């Protein structure tokens, strides 16, 4: 069984391949970022991408396929819950929308290699 760090690194690398030249940030949030997770916790990951909000859905299938590939490779070690967010939209609203504010304050950035 892989550890969470390996899973996150593979996810971040795969995200870079999916988004190509688009600038992305991968951010761990929720119980894993706070350190209060348990055996049933999912791994919450936000992908902040420098894309218009209307294009967020365009990448969903590829991100889900990446998760399936990671699940196949590591035997469903963790349940990954991704969300794709337009970085320009996030930058505009991160002080107003509570979820975005928490993501900015509590999220842990994962290096995208």
Language-model regions, residue ranges each:
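Conserved H-loop
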Residues: 31
């Amino acid at each position: 069984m892989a550890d969470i760090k390996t899973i996150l690194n593979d996810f971040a690398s795969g995200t870079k391949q999916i988004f190509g030249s688009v600038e992305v940030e991968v951010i761990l949030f929720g119980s894993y970022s706070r350190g209060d997770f348990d055996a049933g916790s999912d791994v919450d990951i936000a992908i902040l991408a420098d894309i218009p909000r209307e294009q967020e859905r365009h990448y969903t299938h590829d991100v889900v396929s990446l998760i399936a590939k990671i699940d196949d490779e590591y035997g469903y070690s963790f349940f990954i819950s991704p969300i794709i967010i337009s970085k320009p939209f996030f930058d505009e609203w991160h002080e107003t929308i509570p979820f975005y504010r928490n993501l900015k304050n509590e999220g842990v950035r994962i290096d995208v290699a």
